[in-house]
């Protein structure tokens, strides 16, 4: 069966049906809007990326997006979330620079620039889902951005790490997958990066293709870059919350895109 935006829209409408929800399929923009009729809050889904995931994962891709939307809508329907008293549940999350900088209510989200490809947003963990922290939440509780930043960084460092190692063509790859929603966020833990940098025999390259994986690679020969690039693209295409297929090199505490450095690296005769 060939999946189209119309077919996908119909499937999602059926799976997400609720007495208080409305759906709006926009054929020109290839989007589906899911909205709570009482609060007028909702989520707009970009359908082509979901179709791409469906071609790889079939029904599993549908299950993932239904779960994500259901949890997010439930959170929206609940009472206003407060940060005070829940400080240990505030974490940084990595998103692409194309990710919206405002909430569905047009409230500016709190974020910091990270790289040319990524931003750091801040989230209040609600268990099965989370709420991105916005400017209104800060003002209501009289929090500063610096307090959010420091609290999130402290909590991130307290998270346990789950790492799997693989060796391909003489290059070593380390996959951080604790499946706690903050695997990609561990790119912000400099202690981890510095430890792997210290023990790397080659260049330390890093990839955050989607929210639920961080890849560190000890690149010991030129083929390692291509292998990491292929891995990153595969993870990027299959992720529920994709970030970037681009990889970075880590040197002197800084991240730089691999393709920029490759262009500037002189070729040997």
UniProtKB/Swiss-Prot annotation:
Homology family: Belongs to the UPF0354 family.
HAMAP family the UniProt entry points to: UPF0354
Coiled-coil zones: none
Species assigned in the record: Bacillus subtilis (strain 168)
Protein name, per record: UPF0354 protein YtpQ
The encoding gene: ytpQ
